[in-house]
Every structure is written in structure tokens, then in C-alpha cells.
């Protein structure tokens, strides 16, 4: 059986290839734009390295991060222990490597939760207005009026210590800025001519929201979420420092600083190295967020 070049099967395959080529070209162009900004490239590279380290932690870490060796306690950085050891003789480099998994777990889980939640509440408030807007925005104002770390601390204190409770607490404090941003975007789009035209064609409110307004709000929301990731890392580290995050002996970066602060004057590496890990990764997400803003939001130029 032969297939004509003009058959629907052939034309469909050709259209599929063209779509793939266009998508690949857009991806290459997007990466090229990011690479032209040195800080964005550095931030993206650090985050990519963090992902690789978290995925291949068992292959990268030379020691078990939980096994204690009191004979090697508080050893300074050397060829055997690159970043030294803590007060229990555990290799700090190995604990940092495995701690990257905890950090990414919190960041990714909070981000995929607060994004849809904030977007849903924000576009609903901006589009429907009236009492819906008033109620949702007053609730948002209540959450925003408290510092995020203080509010997260209150939620974790109520829920109890633990990694899952930290995720819930940070989620409850991270959605309000996204909701306000989505509301502002929706207010600017609600009276646009093309939205009025869609309504005149008989489109329902749900169709207008999900097919027209939400896609236009996504770039700003993605940028905000990316820049929020640095705050998520710092909040998680703060809760871990206070003993409310991942519980010992889990290698959470904030908890590592807390347990090593007693020895920080004599053994600087116990506190300094986890602190640098938090600082570098927070800056990386900020750099990446700035680059995404320049690419996805032309109004920022």
C-alpha cells in the first residue's frame, strides 16, 4: 500500500514536524536570550547543578550523611572531608548533597501549590469584582500584613514540627503576593476590547477566564514564583534553624547551622558552609527570576 504525498496522513505528519521545529526554535531562542544575560546564566547554571546534585546524591556523596564517627568530630576541611565534619563526625559535604533534596522538595512542592492557588484567587477577585473581590482581598491583606517567617512560624507551631508541616505553613504564607499580582493583571485585562468581543460572542465567564485571561497572567505569575523561591529557601532554613523543619538527623541546611552554632568560633566550617549553600542558591533563584522577567515581560524593559 502506498501513501500519496498529498494524503491526510502525510500532511498531518508534516504539520507535526513543523510544530516540533517551531517549538524547538522557540526553546533555543529562549535559552539564547537567557545566556546573553551573565547573571541569569549563572543563576540557571547553579540551579541546574542543584538539580543534578539532588538527583545523583547517592553517587556524589562520599559518605553516609547520617552515620556518626565521633573519632572524626569537628575535623577541618581536608582531602578526605572536603568541607570538614560536624560535631558528630558526619561529613558536611555529604550532608549538603543530601540536604539539597530537602531544599528542592520544599521549593518545588510549595511552588506548584501556591502558583495555581494564587492565580485562581487573584483572577477570580479581579474578574468578578464586587463582594468576591472584597472578601478575597481582605483575606489576602490579613495574610500579607504579617511577615512571612512569623506567620509560617505560627502555623508550624500549631501543626507541629516536620517537613510536611513546613510545606503547608510556607504555602499558606506564599500565595497572597501571587493573588494580588494576578488580580492586578486581571483588572487591566477585564475591560480590554478583545475580552468584550469574546463576551459578545456568548462565551461564559469560565471560558473567558481560562482561555483568555489566565494565559495572559501566566508569565507574570511564573516570574513571581521564581523570585519567591529564594524566600521559600530562606523561610525553610529559618524554620529548620528553630528546630521546626526536618527533624534530626536529617541533613536540612538550616538545622545544620543551628546544631553547629555552638562551635562556630573555633570550627567556622560547621556554620559557614551550610550558610553559603543557602546564600548561593537563594541568589541563583533571584538571578533567574530577573532574567525571566526581562524575557517574558516586555513591559519591564
Task: Report each predicted region and the residues it spans.
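Transmembrane alpha-helical segments of polytopic membrane transport and secretion proteins
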Residues: 1-45, 287-301
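Amphipathic cytosolic juxtamembrane alpha-helices at the membrane-cytosol interface
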Residues: 90-105, 109, 129-137, 187-191, ...
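Transmembrane alpha-helices
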Residues: 101-117, 146, 152, 206-238, ...
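Generic hydrophobic transmembrane alpha-helix motif, especially the helices
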Residues: 82, 86, 116-120, 126-189, ...
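Transmembrane alpha-helix signature in integral membrane proteins
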Residues: 43-44, 92-127, 281
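C-terminal transmembrane helix and the adjacent membrane-cytosol boundary/short C-terminal tail
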Residues: 172-173, 219-227, 268-301
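Periplasmic/extracellular loop-to-transmembrane helix junction in inner-membrane transport proteins
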Residues: 29-36, 63-111, 255-275
Amino acid at each position: 500500500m502506498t501513501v500519496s504525498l498529498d494524503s491526510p496522513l502525510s500532511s498531518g505528519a508534516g504539520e507535526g514536524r513543523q510544530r516540533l521545529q517551531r517549538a524547538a526554535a522557540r526553546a533555543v531562542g529562549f535559552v539564547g536570550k537567557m545566556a546573553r544575560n551573565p547573571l541569569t546564566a549563572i543563576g540557571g547554571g547553579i540551579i541546574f547543578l542543584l538539580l543534578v546534585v539532588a538527583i545523583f546524591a547517592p553517587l556524589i556523596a562520599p559518605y553516609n550523611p547520617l552515620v556518626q564517627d565521633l573519632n572524626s568530630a569537628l575535623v577541618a576541611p581536608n582531602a578526605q572531608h572536603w568541607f570538614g565534619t560536624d560535631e558528630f563526625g558526619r561529613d558536611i559535604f555529604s550532608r549538603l548533597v543530601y540536604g539539597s533534596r530537602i531544599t528542592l522538595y520544599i521549593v518545588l512542592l510549595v511552588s506548584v501549590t501556591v502558583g495555581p492557588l494564587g492565580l485562581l484567587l487573584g483572577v477570580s477577585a479581579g474578574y468578578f469584582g464586587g463582594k468576591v473581590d472584597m472578601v478575597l482581598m481582605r483575606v489576602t491583606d490579613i495574610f500579607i500584613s504579617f511577615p512571612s517567617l512569623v506567620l509560617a512560624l505560627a502555623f508550624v507551631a500549631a501543626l507541629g514540627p516536620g517537613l510536611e508541616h513546613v510545606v503547608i505553613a510556607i504555602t499558606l504564607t506564599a500565595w497572597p503576593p501571587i493573588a494580588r499580582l494576578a488580580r492586578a493583571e486581571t483588572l487591566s485585562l477585564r475591560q480590554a476590547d478583545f475580552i468584550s468581543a469574546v463576551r459578545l460572542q456568548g462565551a461564559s465567564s469560565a471560558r473567558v477566564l481560562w482561555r483568555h485571561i489566565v494565559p495572559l497572567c501566566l508569565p507574570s505569575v511564573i516570574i513571581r514564583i521564581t523570585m519567591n523561591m529564594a524566600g521559600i529557601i530562606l523561610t525553610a532554613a529559618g524554620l529548620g534553624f528553630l528546630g521546626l523543619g526536618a527533624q534530626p538527623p536529617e541533613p536540612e541546611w538550616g538545622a545544620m547551622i543551628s546544631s553547629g552554632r555552638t562551635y562556630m568560633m573555633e570550627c567556622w566550617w560547621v556554620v559557614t558552609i551550610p550558610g553559603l549553600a543557602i546564600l548561593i542558591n537563594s541568589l541563583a533563584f533571584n538571578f533567574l527570576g530577573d532574567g525571566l522577567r526581562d524575557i517574558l515581560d516586555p513591559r519591564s524593559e
